[in-house]
């Protein structure tokens, strides 16, 4: 794990970070309907495919890897890994599992499946223990679709990493759409960066999981 400290005095975002981190602490969220038609047509498992795609784009851009590490240093990680929730039907609780990222989907899927076998039934907040500091949170609410979603974190204004929440997919105009809520910190991520992320995520979904009819 590599963490590169940021020199705030020479950082191009110094003024913006100071404003949205210290003067007017600000996080924001938005929901985007992603076209997952081809992914569903292929019969791929939705959760690991989305975890892979999201993490791939997170690892492309520094603004989604910028954080304050346990030592209190501002900087960015070279690579991130997803930490995601799994639901326990028997007692209606959930646990968090983290999976090591791999650039190739089949390799990531193998890591995911191994973690599910080992930790999928483990109870408690952390089903898989000892998550590394270079993880980011992902969750899914598969029982409901939504067009708005927001996390209210009372002490979360020093949390700089993105938070992703997926909802229930639905049909519209012949397409299968998946709502994805993304919460980011304005000190490191502007609207431009968020929209670029979504555009690249949508493109990757079509590229990595092309329609079998093509």
Sequence positions of predicted segments:
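Helical lid/core segments from catalytic subdomains that handle acyl or acyl-like groups
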Residues: 88-146
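Flexible, Gly/Pro-enriched loop and linker segments at secondary-structure and domain junctions
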Residues: 1-31, 126, 132-175
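Acyl activation and transfer enzymes in specialized metabolism, enriched
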Residues: 38-62, 178-197
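Active-site-proximal acidic secondary-structure segment that organizes catalysis
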Residues: 158-213
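Gly/Ser/Thr-rich phosphate-binding loops and adjoining beta-strand/alpha-helix segments
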Residues: 3, 21-49, 66-80, 95, ...
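Short, charge-patterned binding micro-sites
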Residues: 76-90
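Solvent-exposed residues in well-ordered beta-strands and their adjoining turns
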Residues: 33-37, 87, 167, 183-185
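Domain-scale detector for complete catalytic domains at protein termini or as standalone homologs
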Residues: 1-11, 25-26, 34, 55, ...
């Amino acid at each position: 794990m590599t963490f590169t400290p940021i020199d705030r005095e020479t950082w191009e975002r110094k003024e913006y970070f100071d404003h949205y981190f210290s003067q007017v602490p600000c996080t924001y969220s938005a929901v985007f309907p992603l076209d997952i038609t081809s992914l569903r047509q292929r019969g791929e498992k939705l959760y690991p495919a989305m975890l892979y795609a999201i993490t791939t784009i997170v690892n492309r851009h520094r603004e989604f890897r910028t954080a304050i590490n346990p030592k209190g240093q501002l900087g960015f990680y070279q690579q991130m890994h997803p930490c995601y929730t799994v639901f326990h039907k028997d007692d209606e609780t959930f646990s968090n599992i983290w999976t090591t990222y791999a650039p190739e989907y089949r390799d990531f899927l193998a890591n995911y499946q191994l973690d599910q076998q080992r930790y999928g039934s483990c109870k408690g907040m952390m089903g898989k223990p000892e998550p590394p500091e270079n993880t980011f949170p992902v969750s899914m609410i598969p029982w409901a679709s939504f067009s708005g979603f927001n996390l209210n974190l009372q002490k979360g204004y020093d949390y700089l990493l993105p938070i992703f929440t997926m909802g229930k997919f639905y049909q519209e105009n012949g397409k299968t759409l998946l709502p994805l809520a993304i919460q980011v910190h304005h000190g490191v991520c502007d609207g431009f960066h968020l929209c670029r992320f979504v555009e690249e995520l949508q493109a990757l979904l079509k590229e990595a999981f092309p329609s079998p009819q093509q």
